[in-house]
Amino acid sequence: MPMSLRVATLLALLLFVVACGAKQTNEESESEECVTEQTMLVAELEEGKTCEVIADFGVVTHRAIVEMPIRVVNATDEPIVLVDYSTTCRCTMLDLDRAPIEAGGECEIVLTFDSRGEWGGVGNFLDITTSNPECGFVIWMGATVE
């Protein structure tokens, strides 16, 4: 997929994030290589909707492994479990807490991107399976590896 199409797709999906209720808060994050300010993404799971989150890692140094926490909020009336996920690339991983998220509760998951073997614009898709088939959850991940 041409890079301009990837960028256009990520920008278009950013508009969908607003519609599903994803919110952002600023938090500081430390890694072994540097200290950076990072945006904490919030995914709000609602019955009858698919929550789409765009996780933009920005510029990533080649061979770096970077993480982004995502707060998942259960806005339904029933407990939800994040059962499993599928991804378009093995360089993108998700650390799921498979404990039930109570109604109105929240948990934190961690999205990891391993840039080893990647160059230039990278865009991946993660589809998270929940215990409620009426609550969809997807993550669009982007990074530029230099």
Language-model regions, residue ranges each:
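Terminal connector regions
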Residues: 25-29, 119-145
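Beta-sheet-dominated interaction scaffolds and their linkers
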Residues: 27-75, 142-145
